[in-house]
């Protein structure tokens, strides 16, 4: 990854895809191998159900993305770039995660190459993020997103943890919790009003003169990007759709 050498990874990925196809042939020979694998993540979902939804999204999103790119109005987000000390980023993320309800006596937050949430039990839930010195918002919103997953995990049944009733219902339900917090809550005017003082206290040189409205516009800027987890609310679905079509 650090050397950007996909050629080293490609043979392993090829083998994995071949094994997933073989697995599907043994486990669910009555359906396509892709439908069998979809069912692992979203029970009952099939290409026949998903494709029309994605086609509908594409018909609306592609013109919208084009209109945004061609718009004369471009919100100022320059103050979101700078030099943000990593320990301050960590403290800010932890504070907001706690405010959301994540119980650190039943979980922890660490650093990883790619943000994720995991753990073996509702009393041991692990969330991770990654830090960039020049962009604190990437880490903060990763923390918020993964805390959404973590809250779902910490809310699962403690009794009968090995039984189906204690399992996460589906990937879609799980992702609905993380994206609800990240998009609906953390990109809202109310969130920006509530947390601008804390952000300004953490990074005064950048945010002392910034209004909540400016912050709200900056965290909602929409522009195409190569990285799914860094994508905005408008372009994010296109990352998912593109992967689906490639697969």
Annotated model-derived regions:
Residues 42, 62, 66-69, 73, ...:
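Hydrophobic/aromatic-lined pockets within catalytic cores
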Residues 73-79, 125-133, 157-165, 226-231, ...:
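Glycine- and acidic
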Residues 187-247:
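Long, amphipathic alpha-helical stalk/connector segments used for oligomerization, subunit docking
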């Amino acid at each position: 990854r650090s050397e950007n050498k996909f050629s080293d990874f490609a043979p392993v990925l090829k083998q994995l895809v071949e094994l997933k196809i073989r697995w599907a042939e043994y486990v669910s020979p009555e359906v396509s191998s892709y439908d069998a694998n979809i069912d692992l993540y979203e029970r009952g979902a099939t290409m026949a159900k998903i494709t029309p939804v994605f086609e509908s999204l594409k018909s609306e999103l592609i013109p919208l993305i084009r209109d945004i790119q061609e718009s004369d109005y471009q919100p100022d987000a320059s103050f979101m770039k700078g030099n943000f000390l990593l320990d301050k980023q960590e403290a800010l993320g932890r504070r907001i995660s706690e405010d959301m309800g994540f119980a650190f006596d039943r979980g922890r937050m660490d650093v990883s190459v790619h943000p994720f949430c995991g753990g073996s039990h509702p009393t041991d839930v692990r969330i991770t993020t990654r830090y960039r010195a020049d962009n604190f918002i990437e880490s903060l919103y990763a923390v918020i997103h993964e805390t959404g997953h973590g809250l779902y995990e910490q809310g699962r049944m403690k009794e009968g943890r090995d039984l189906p009733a204690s399992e996460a219902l589906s990937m879609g339900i799980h992702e609905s919790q993380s994206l609800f917090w990240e998009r609906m809550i953390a990109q809202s005017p109310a969130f920006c009003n509530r947390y601008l003082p804390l952000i300004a206290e953490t990074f005064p040189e950048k945010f002392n003169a910034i209004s909540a409205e400016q912050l709200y516009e900056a965290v909602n800027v929409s522009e195409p990007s190569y990285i799914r987890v860094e994508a905005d609310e408008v372009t994010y679905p296109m990352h998912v759709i593109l992967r689906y079509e490639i697969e």
